């Protein structure tokens, strides 16, 4: 069984995050940016971890960090959460893991946030299709650089939220159990 978990990124995790970035060169080609150097990632983490609205998580499968989730709460408005980045290592893509991570995030945030937003850089039809496949709709046109997709979660009473979370968690766990994810070598 290959269940994933999301684990908080710590200040000393810059080398692991930089390794994950380096294992995803197509993403950086798509956004026309070089793969960040370790010193750039170190500064990025220092800045993000000092912002109380940011939440950074590694996506972990079988003890290996194979993805990264960068969130900003109450942005652009109170009650919103923006996915700054959902990155799954290229060797782990096209297996449904990104969708599982987002379903799990939606479950965790259900009843606590109004909506989730995600930006798609440039004309990235694959990313747009990913978000649309998860029920996100085109929300804001900031082209040529960025298009925003959004999904309303809605606030719910605590009792209904707990029941929904239990049902959604069971679904996510069943889907995760069906994944066959080979190991990704990580820098130590």
Task: Locate each region found by the language model.
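Conserved beta-strand-loop-alpha-helix junction that forms the acyl-donor binding cleft
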Residues: 93, 118-128, 145-146
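Glycine-rich phosphate-binding loop
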Residues: 96
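Conserved GNAT acetyl-CoA-binding A-motif
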Residues: 109-120
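Long, intrinsically disordered low-complexity tandem-repeat segments
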Residues: 161-186
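Short, charged/polar, Gly/Pro-enriched secondary-structure boundary elements
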Residues: 155-160
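Acetyl-CoA-dependent GNAT
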Residues: 3-4, 8-14, 18-93, 102-104, ...
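Accessory recognition modules or surfaces
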Residues: 99, 149-154
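Conserved active-site alpha-helix within GNAT-family acetyltransferase domains
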Residues: 99, 122-140
């Amino acid at each position: 069984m290959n269940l994933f978990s999301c684990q908080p990124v710590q200040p000393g995790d810059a080398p692991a995050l930089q390794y994950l970035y380096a294992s995803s060169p197509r993403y950086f080609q798509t956004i026309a940016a070089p793969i960040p150097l370790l010193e750039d990632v170190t500064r990025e983490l220092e800045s993000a971890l000092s912002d109380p609205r940011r939440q950074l998580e590694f996506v972990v499968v079988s003890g290996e960090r194979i993805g990264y989730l960068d969130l900003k709460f109450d942005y652009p408005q109170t009650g919103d959460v923006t996915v700054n980045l959902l990155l799954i290592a290229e060797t782990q893509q096209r297996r449904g893991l990104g969708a599982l991570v987002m379903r799990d995030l939606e479950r965790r945030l259900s009843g606590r946030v109004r909506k989730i937003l995600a930006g798609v850089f440039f004309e990235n039809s694959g990313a747009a299709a990913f978000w649309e496949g998860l029920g996100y709709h085109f929300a804001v046109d900031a082209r040529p650089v960025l298009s925003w997709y959004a999904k309303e979660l809605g606030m719910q009473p605590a009792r209904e939220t707990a029941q929904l979370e239990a049902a959604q968690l069971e679904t996510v766990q069943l889907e995760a159990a069906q994944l066959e994810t080979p190991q990704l070598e990580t820098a130590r």
